[in-house]
């Protein structure tokens, strides 16, 4: 599989645009005489969450002109890399909000770096679904694809310190694991209504898995061989919609519970950040809800980046935001 890199060391933060019921404020109507786009004011403000964010901090809109954003991770220089599935590229965003293309011809939703500094990405291009080493040039490698027993299509990934890759398969209701040697895969967790975002604790003893159609964020104990045990409810989501409607996935009446739970991130203190229905829900390492950062749109994924990893970037529904935090993202992993 070949990918075209057009910006060495860069990458864009891109989101797909979805239809919204009402026209965005300040956006000219279709067919207007002066179609120059004026970004809407979609900033929100944080509550005071001790140790996490000061009250009244702006959740600042960077852009709402993206196409399928997902999978943000921090690059070594502090800039942010994320996926733009609708545009089939990876995008980089610098500290000033400037976007640049990092890699083309890939429809990804999850990114990570292995201990060798290689970029791992899933690709959901029809007919090419798999998980690959995609960067640097010359190091490209297939880890799993549709010829691999047990693999169908992945949503999000996290790479452990040994180079193993955990990934969610929503349609198969399971979590897979690719060992550090990159040979094959195994299913390590099953019977999750709709697994979505995934991350690990700083010491990598706990695997966290979001269930976007369940009431609880799940936790598992990680074993030396990469398998997981002791499934448990880490916390009940701060907001759950109990409408029978299927929401944004599949036909109506498919699920009775919608948590909207999508991407996950952690900070250096072990707090867990969940992209939920009502914003970014922050939980203590023990699962206590500490507060929620409100957002103007539903967020799909998030990551800490910046020179000191104290900027929390949010992507989703065709837009990207950033918020300055009091805490630092976990420095030992890209996300």
Which residue stretches match the model-derived regions?
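Bacterial N-terminal signal peptides that target proteins for export
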Residues: 1-11
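Bacterial N-terminal signal peptides
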Residues: 9-19
């Amino acid at each position: 599989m070949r990918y075209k890199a057009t910006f060495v060391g860069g990458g864009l933060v891109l989101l797909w645009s979805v239809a919204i019921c009402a026209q965005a404020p300040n956006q000219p109507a279709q067919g207007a005489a002066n179609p120059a786009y004026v970004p809407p004011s979609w900033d929100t403000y944080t509550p005071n969450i001790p140790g996490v964010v000061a009250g009244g901090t702006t959740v600042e809109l960077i852009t709402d002109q993206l196409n399928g954003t997902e999978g943000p991770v921090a690059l070594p220089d502090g800039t942010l890399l994320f996926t733009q599935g609708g545009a089939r590229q990876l995008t980089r965003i610098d500290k000033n909000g400037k976007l640049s293309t990092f890699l083309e011809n890939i429809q990804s939703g999850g990114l990570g770096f292995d201990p060798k500094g290689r970029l791992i990405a899933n690709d959901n291009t029809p007919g090419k679904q798999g998980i690959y080493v995609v960067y640097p040039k010359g190091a490209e490698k297939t880890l799993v694809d549709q010829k691999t027993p047990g693999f169908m299509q992945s949503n999000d990934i996290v790479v452990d310190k040994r180079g193993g890759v955990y990934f969610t398969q929503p349609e198969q209701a399971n979590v897979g694991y690719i060992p550090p040697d990159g040979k094959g895969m195994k299913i390590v967790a099953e019977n999750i209504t709709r697994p979505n975002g995934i991350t690990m604790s700083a010491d990598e003893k706990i695997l966290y898995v979001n269930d976007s159609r369940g009431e609880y964020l799940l936790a598992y104990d990680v074993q030396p061989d990469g398998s997981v045990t002791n499934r448990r409810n880490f916390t009940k989501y701060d907001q759950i919609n109990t409408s029978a409607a299927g929401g944004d996935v599949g036909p109506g009446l498919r699920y009775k519970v919608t948590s909207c739970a999508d991407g996950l991130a952690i900070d250096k203190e072990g707090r867990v950040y969940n992209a939920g229905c009502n914003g970014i829900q922050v939980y203590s390492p023990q699962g206590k809800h500490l507060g929620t950062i409100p957002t103007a749109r539903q967020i799909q994924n998030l990551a800490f980046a910046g020179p000191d990893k104290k900027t929390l970037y949010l992507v989703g529904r065709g837009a990207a935001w950033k918020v300055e935090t009091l805490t630092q993202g976990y420095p030992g992993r890209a996300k």
